[in-house]
């Protein structure tokens, strides 16, 4: 099958399919990580012999061709005022024009996230099947954002609304939580296909806890929804009673020169905390293998890809009991520990639960690993997508 994917592509994930010159173009114009779940899906399609053409935001316009895959980079508007106001609309219209002559040889178009790529792809839903996987819920994100960021997100909420009104686009949810939100909005059932994980992420041997009780958090941002300050406070409560412990936080904002991090340090919230900044996605395996527990303090997630990555490395996991799709991924507590992540004392209590019951926590982690192995491995998730595509193609042909 010939598949068009709209996503923010991570360069590192597909380097193996390109020659040296093309690799340089990719590394110069794309972020190294992008969206790991969609990266994994793309690689899974390629492994099964499908052709994939990826349309992605980039530093500059470019086109590269590799082994069974092509990447079309589309430069975003970088004017400051435009970028943080109507930029999403400008980019959507530009993408629509740019892809016009690059989609006719494709069997299906699939946009991930319901913004620029989804709107652009949706303009061609009258000639071929177009799918959109809803990977966040824009109105809810708007509520969490600061007053300044609400300006930007007001435009994104409007664009998301226009995408969801496209009658010919077939929507997909990445969790029952997202599917329920979409059902209420669209007044119809929406199929659910969860995020995939690469088989290479699965750890074959058992997890061994480090000598120092190590708490690991991976977060792509430092906004209110990600709730990092509550984690820091909860860890400090835990650390006062169990000083053989450390907290490691991975993600681009988490460096000592970041203004928020400086403020946390001044408040005494960084005692025994290591800010590790952005790390290569493949290197996360090493950090997971050397931690005692993984925690996501997010107040809301439509899935939470880092949760299944921790499962895949056989690591105990803590997440929020009311945090969107997190309880679903954690099997309502069967595959991990649920707590009130909005309360620092509850976070500390969950950390203590794992700390004081290492054997039990590793048994729960083993159950989580088995669940990942049977439900989330990319081979299965790719097949579920292809089945969905084939049904849509058949209806268009008929």
Description of each model-found segment:
Residues 332-344, 353-358:
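Conserved acidic donor-binding segment of nucleotide-sugar-dependent glycosyltransferases
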Residues 316-320:
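Short hydrophobic beta-strand element within catalytic cores of glycosyltransferases
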Residues 207-226, 232-236, 248:
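Conserved donor-binding/catalytic core segment of Leloir-type glycosyltransferases
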Residues 218-219, 246-261, 277:
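Glycosyltransferase donor-sugar binding loop
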Residues 177, 196:
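Carbohydrate-associated surface elements
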